[in-house]
């Protein structure tokens, strides 16, 4: 298994509940709520790895799952912001589809966001999925995609190319998404941020002018380095978003990112959705003050806009 992925696994294995694997029903995973009470709306969630048959062992911080195919192994990796299921595919004869059944309300849909997919039941977001990826043993990308139907997420991996070097590693990763209610329209919130970004974004080092693509943001929280680069802003009808990417000096480490999305639902609900992918789980897990402070910051961000 890829060593760089093992480095992202936190020491805690009890953050994810693993059960089942009997009577051909798959192995169930339960991800707890992440945000402390009053600091944002998150939803714990349960889903089943349908192609897994049992939880076999723990190796290098990963729970090993046996599967219905001799050519496929699965590994559960707890993350500070959720969980990922790594699927190791040994040959072209292995299945190309890997399905996960989510315990979500009827009518839940998969909605594409900025570098994320969200599970939404119209009036709330239940969590975030990172885009699917698959790489072969040579480090080359393998075509992969998601589909969603009736509570089932399927990752499709195209194993047809003769140039693929096996094994292939594929991954759907579940991360945190925290929701905060807003009182103003998407356009009004965007206008406020464009007029004075640091007036509302509650992190020291934020610039007065709305950031430009590639701009370094020297953000600091106490003594901790939160330096980011501004990746881009994204716009659509009733929707506005922007993304920060962590620099090498950031405590979350290079490769981490965070997305802020302003959305208006068909029922009139307006909200700020903050979703993150954190590489440096060790810092997150060893610093509960950082965890709580993160949610306080984003709660204050929404509050500042609501009070304007």
Residue ranges with predicted function:
Residues 1-174:
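Residues that cap or anchor secondary-structure elements
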Residues 61-63, 81-84, 209-219, 237-246:
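Short, hydrophobic/aromatic-rich segments at coil-to-beta transitions
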Residues 91, 102-104, 159, 174, ...:
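A mature extracytoplasmic/lumenal domain signature
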Residues 91, 169, 173-225:
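Hydrophobic ligand-binding cavity/cleft-lining segments
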Residues 96, 191-195, 299, 303:
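Solvent-exposed, polar/charged alpha-helical surfaces in well-ordered, non-transmembrane soluble domains
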Residues 130-137, 145-149, 289-308:
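Cys-His-centered catalytic/binding microenvironment captured across papain-like cysteine peptidases
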Residues 162, 248-295:
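Beta-strand/loop substructures that line and gate deep hydrophobic ligand-binding cavities in soluble
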Residues 225-265:
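Hydrophobic-ligand binding "helix-grip"
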């Amino acid at each position: 298994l890829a060593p760089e992925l093992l480095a992202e696994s936190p020491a805690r294995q009890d953050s994810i509940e693993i059960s089942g694997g009997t009577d051909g029903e798959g192995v169930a995973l339960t991800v707890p709520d992440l945000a402390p009470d009053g600091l944002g709306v998150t939803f714990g969630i349960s889903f089943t790895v349908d192609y897994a048959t049992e939880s076999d062992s723990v190796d290098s911080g990963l729970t090993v799952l046996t599967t219905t195919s001799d050519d496929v192994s699965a590994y559960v990796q707890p993350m500070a912001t959720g969980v990922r299921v790594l699927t190791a595919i040994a040959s072209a004869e292995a299945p190309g589809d890997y399905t996960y059944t989510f315990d979500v309300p009827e009518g839940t849909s998969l909605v594409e966001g900025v570098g994320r997919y969200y599970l939404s039941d119209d009036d709330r977001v239940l969590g975030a999925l990172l885009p699917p990826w698959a790489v072969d043993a040579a480090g080359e990308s393998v075509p992969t995609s998601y589909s969603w139907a009736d509570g089932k997420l399927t990752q499709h991996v195209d194993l047809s190319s003769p140039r693929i070097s096996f094994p292939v590693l594929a991954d759907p990763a579940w991360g945190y998404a925290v929701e905060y209610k807003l009182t103003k329209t998407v356009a009004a919130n965007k206008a406020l941020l464009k007029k004075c970004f640091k007036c509302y974004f509650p992190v020291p080092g934020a610039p007065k002018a709305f950031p430009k693509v590639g701009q370094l943001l020297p953000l600091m929280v106490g003594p901790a380095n939160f330096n980011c680069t501004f990746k881009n802003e994204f716009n659509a009808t009733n929707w506005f978003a922007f993304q920060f990417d962590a620099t090498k000096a950031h405590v979350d480490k290079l490769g981490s990112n965070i997305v802020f999305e302003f959305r208006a639902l068909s029922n009139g609900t307006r909200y700020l959705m903050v979703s993150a992918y954190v590489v440096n789980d060790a810092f997150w897990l060893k610093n509960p003050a950082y965890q709580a402070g993160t949610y306080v910051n984003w709660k204050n961000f929404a509050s500042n806009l609501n009070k304007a």
